């Protein structure tokens, strides 16, 4: 206020204000929305849904005549019947309102429902009023892709579809059909029965995805080394002279992979890195140690690698445990895909077919379609499938959520 808002504001990683309810978003908006000169930079303006872009628009335009709602029709889903409803836009020709009212209007104008692991197979993820959104993006967003800047496309994505072994399917079915029996072994009660009931499905989904990453992280598993871990070990054995990076999301999944690599490839140097066990300074020093190993294996949690350290000499990356969107995973694998890279980078996604992981992959692809649209690259799902190396019928492997005779949700 003392400067009359005559300041220049540059905001890197502006997608950090994608959550309109967070204190960070509210603080940034209250401090800088009236600044005269603003530049927002980010690798991806949205991660999960289009409405995440609304706070960034609000920061740029401050709900002025530069962000007018030109969508004549608003869309929403009826929660009971799941039917699409539409109505006239009461704010047509007016600036989009501030805060929650504006975020709701923005979502209902373009994508009225979030993409979920079950919704990907039930509803298409088309963008409504796409021309109006494209017109707004056209005057707001300037996009330069990695390929445009470097003049080369060095990323190659490979899918590794893997079937369940009987013992792996057995532990998967325990969580699927008898979750009530083992729930308290993995999740503590909140002390509130209503909250416990609301959390049950989320906890079940989380555990199913954990099993899909490493079945032997469950004590109910009674088989040998799971097939996915063996597929990763066999891939490592095919690259005896390569430095390889493996990224998971949870330490509970990391431990089984570390044990399998030590058992089957004891001669290969193994570097295990997590944010909680290795200091930041050691993680930065890891770069030269890994390069000097010649054929070392970096096994880490995806969020543990500091963004200031790059490993451009690593050409093989395996991701056995996926994030909920490609933006989250790219924060990890782009540590290895750099502007200075000269060799091709191979990304591998081992996936258990017929598990909830298939739904997760389809959700990642659906979100990637939205992300590409926000960057001015309107692509259909066939192009997205080709980009991610999906050459099998992914939709036929999706799991569904149903309501039983007693009104309980079941997967």
Where are these regions (language model features)?
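PAPS/PAP-binding and catalytic site of the sulfotransferase fold
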Residues: 49-60, 172-173, 257, 310-311
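Short, solvent-exposed loop/turn segments at secondary-structure junctions
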Residues: 15-17, 28, 44-47, 60-62, ...
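A conserved SF2-helicase RecA2
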Residues: 324-333, 337-411
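Conserved Helicase C-terminal RecA-like lobe
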Residues: 151-171, 176, 190-309, 378-411
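Inter-lobe coupling linker of SF2 helicases/translocases
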Residues: 22-34, 66-217, 239-241, 364-366
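Conserved RecA-like P-loop NTPase helicase motor core
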Residues: 18, 268-359, 367
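Signature of the SF2 helicase/ATPase Hel1-core->accessory helical subdomain module
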Residues: 2-105, 322-327, 336-338
């Amino acid at each position: 206020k003392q400067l009359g808002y005559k300041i220049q504001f540059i905001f890197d990683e502006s997608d950090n204000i994608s959550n309109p309810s967070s204190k960070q978003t509210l603080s940034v908006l209250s401090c800088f929305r009236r600044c005269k000169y603003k530049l927002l930079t980010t690798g991806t303006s949205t991660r999960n849904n289009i409405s995440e872009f609304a706070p960034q628009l609000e920061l740029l335009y401050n709900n002025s005549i530069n962000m007018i709602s030109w969508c004549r029709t608003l869309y929403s889903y009826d929660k009971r019947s799941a039917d699409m409803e539409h109505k006239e836009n009461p704010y047509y020709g007016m600036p989009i309102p501030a805060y929650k009212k504006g975020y709701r209007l923005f979502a209902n104008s373009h994508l009225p429902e979030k993409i979920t692991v079950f919704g990907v197979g039930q509803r298409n993820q088309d963008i409504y009023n796409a021309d109006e959104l494209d017109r707004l993006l056209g005057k707001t967003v300037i996009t330069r892709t990695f390929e445009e800047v470097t003049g080369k496309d060095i990323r190659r994505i490979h899918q590794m579809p893997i079937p369940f072994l009987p013992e792996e399917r057995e532990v998967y079915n325990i969580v699927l059909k008898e979750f009530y029996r083992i729930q308290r072994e993995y999740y503590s009660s909140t002390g509130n029965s209503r909250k416990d009931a609301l959390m049950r499905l989320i906890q079940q989904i989380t555990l199913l995805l954990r099993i899909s990453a490493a079945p032997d992280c469950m004590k109910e598993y009674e088989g040998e080394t799971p097939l996915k871990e063996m597929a990763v070990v066999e891939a490592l054995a095919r690259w005896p002279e390569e430095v390889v990076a493996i990224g998971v999301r949870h330490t509970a999944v990391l431990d089984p992979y570390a044990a399998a690599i030590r058992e089957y490839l004891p001669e290969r140097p193994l570097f295990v890195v997590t944010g909680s066990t290795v200091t930041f300074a050691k993680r930065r020093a890891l770069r030269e140690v890994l390069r000097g190993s010649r054929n070392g294996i970096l096994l880490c949690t995806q969020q543990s690698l500091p963004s200031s350290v790059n490993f451009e000499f690593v050409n093989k990356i395996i991701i056995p445990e996926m994030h909920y969107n490609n933006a989250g995973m790219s924060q990890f694998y782009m540590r290895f895909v750099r502007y200075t890279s000269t060799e091709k980078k191979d990304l591998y996604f081992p996936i258990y077919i017929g598990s909830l992981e298939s739904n997760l992959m389809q959700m990642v692809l659906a979100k990637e379609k939205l992300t590409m649209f926000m960057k001015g690259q309107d692509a259909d799902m066939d192009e997205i499938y080709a980009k991610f190396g999906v050459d099998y019928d992914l939709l036929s492997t999706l799991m569904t959520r149903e309501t039983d005779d007693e009104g309980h949700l079941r997967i």
